């Protein structure tokens, strides 16, 4: 069982912005996020889209997001 709950993309993006990621550029629903010391990350979800636990775990691995950040 995953520690990650399902979350809306808008909530995940807000959590990433709170932990220091910034939107570098955007093309449609694809947002390129940047944070010092981390490689750029492409967040490609529509705001209302549901992101499941396994995808959240993959996002966390590349961004440093934790379940408590949500």
Give names to the regions the model predicted.
Residues 1-70:
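Basic nucleic-acid-binding interfaces
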């Amino acid at each position: 069982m995953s520690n990650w709950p399902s979350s809306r993309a808008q909530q995940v993006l807000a959590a990433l912005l709170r932990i220091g990621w910034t939107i570098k550029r955007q093309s449609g629903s694809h947002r390129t996020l940047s944070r010092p010391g981390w490689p750029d990350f492409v967040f490609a979800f529509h705001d209302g889209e549901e992101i499941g636990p396994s995808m959240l775990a993959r996002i966390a691995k590349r961004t440093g997001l934790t379940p408590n950040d949500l």
